[in-house]
Amino acid sequence: MQTVLAVFAGVLVLVGILGFVLPPAKALTSGAPAYNIFHLCFGVLGGALALWGNDAAMRTFLIGFGAIDLYQALASKLNWFPKQQFRWRPADDVLHVVVGAALVAIGILG
């Protein structure tokens, strides 16, 4: 679980940075500033938990972030908050469902 969280946190930080650097036409995801900040903050938090957190904290993060990802996919389809701020694209929706379900499963199954 610790390794999965460390890798996932690194990917979140990378996605957050790339969102600020890549031109929107070349980005797979929306690149909205609020969305990039979201990825950076949760990536740093996940990395800190992977380094210094206990199993319960890591499990809570994985399940919680997975649930947030699943909510984001649903919010995008139903035009709920924060769709306007994050400006999701169809690729974001697919990633949110796949990553969200995987994180919840890893958090539950350990």
Locate each region found by the language model.
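Membrane-interface extramembranous regions
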Residues: 1-110
